[in-house]
From Swiss-Prot:
Keywords: Cell cycle, Cell division, Cell inner membrane, Cell membrane, Cell shape, Cell wall biogenesis/degradation, Magnesium, Membrane, Metal-binding, Peptidoglycan synthesis, Transferase, Transmembrane, Transmembrane helix
Native source species: Bartonella henselae (strain ATCC 49882 / DSM 28221 / CCUG 30454 / Houston 1) (Rochalimaea henselae)
Enzyme Commission number: 2.7.8.13
Compartments, record wording: Cell inner membrane
Name the record gives this protein: Phospho-N-acetylmuramoyl-pentapeptide-transferase
InterPro entries on file: Glycosyl_transferase_4, PNAcMuramoyl-5peptid_Trfase, PNAcMuramoyl-5peptid_Trfase_CS
Pathway(s) per entry: Cell wall biogenesis; peptidoglycan biosynthesis
Length: 356
């Protein structure tokens, strides 16, 4: 919306700054953060009154988690509200990549909201049917992938390799849908401790904001010899809103958390990250930058598969952050060490932009 005013620079001095992606990214970050910070307390009070007992606590989880009983969930509503308002203010509303990514984020958010709703109202750890939830997620992701295919190319870029792309043809759609769904659920699995998921999400969002900006600028893309995708620079503004909203949410989610993100937020943010990775042709780099999410997801897959084969557990508890809690790490140790891992992995992922 604010981009419109840049066309009035002849009459309004200074508004030409609105045309710059870098300025709008910072503005989106500040706007979303302020919205979440200001309206967060009232949202938390409202959710607490409506939810009563809050999110159910896993009976087989660490004993320290039982003191979290009564903490409201669906904190993703705070995050998504801040992102959407800020995005509509600062993003280019004619950009197709913006709309598709927003579609994925909000659709995944609605799926997560329904899951949270069932858990809270029925006071059970199991919400939405797993098969039904995945089916809806794949439908949303496939629609997004189809649109990306229409406006872009079906190529898969490889990190560390110059000017080489694998033509996926129509396999691009199922592959991209898998990336989006897998990322959404991996972030969802990571969201198990106070503050654990939101910081790695912000780290990944910042990293992909840079990637989106560079990929959408033909001069930078040519210099770095990365795939140029016209229009993806606008995703940096959207991701800036994610970072700002994440900072605002962390104020309330810092231990001891006053609110949990819930599936409403984790599915939505993960889906958005996957969507941006597909749009910018950095799907493989996402596995590095979002390596912590991949680790959490794989730990569950390994735990389930190993148990089916041997009737034993590979980890004391999955996802893997609970394994370390069972090993004796305090919650704050797990959270901060996982934050460090996410930052290191993001730096490694960003290094692929130059190491070719």
């Amino acid at each position: 919306m604010m981009l419109f005013f840049s066309s009035l620079s002849d009459w309004l001095p200074g508004v030409s700054v609105f045309r710059y992606i870098t300025f709008r990214t910072i503005a989106a970050m500040l706007t979303s953060g302020l919205i979440v910070f200001l309206f967060g307390p009232s949202i938390i009070i409202s959710l607490k009154l409506r939810q009563g007992k809050g999110q159910p606590i896993r009976a087989d989880g660490p004993q320290t988690h039982f003191k979290k009983a009564g903490t409201p969930t669906m904190g993703g509503l705070m995050i998504l509200s801040g992102i959407v308002v800020s995005a509509f203010l600062w993003c280019n509303l004619s950009n197709i990549y913006f709309w598709v990514s927003l579609f994925v984020m909000l659709s995944f958010g609605m799926i997560g909201f329904y899951d949270d709703y069932l858990k809270v109202t029925k006071q059970t750890e199991k919400g939405f049917s797993g098969k039904a939830r995945l089916s809806l997620e794949f439908l949303v992701a496939a629609i997004a992938a189809f649109v990306f295919l229409q406006v872009g190319s079906p190529g898969l870029a490889l990190p560390f390799v110059k000017d080489y792309f694998i033509n996926l043809s129509w396999f691009f759609i199922p592959f991209s849908a898998f990336v989006i769904v897998a990322t959404g659920n991996a972030v969802n699995l990571t969201d198990g401790l106070d503050g654990l998921a939101i910081v790695p999400v912000m780290v990944a969002a910042l990293s992909f904001a840079l990637i989106a900006y560079l990929s959408g600028n033909i001069n930078f893309a040519d210099y770095l010899q990365i795939h140029y995708v016209s229009g993806t620079g606008e995703l940096a503004v959207l991701l800036g809103a994610v970072v700002g909203a994440g900072l605002g949410f962390l104020w309330f989610n810092a231990p001891p958390a006053a609110i949990f993100m819930g599936d409403t937020g984790s599915l939505a943010l993960g889906g958005l990250l996957g969507s941006v990775a597909v749009a910018t042709k950095h799907e493989i780099v996402l596995a590095l930058i979002g390596g912590l999410f991949a680790l959490e997801g794989f730990s569950v897959v390994i735990q389930v598969g190993y148990f089916k084969l041997t009737k034993k557990r590979a980890f004391l508890m999955a996802p893997i952050h609970h394994h370390f809690e069972k090993k004796g790490w305090t919650e704050s140790q797990v959270v901060i060490r996982f934050w460090i891992i996410s930052i290191v992995l993001a730096l490694i992922g960003l290094s692929t932009l130059k190491l070719r």
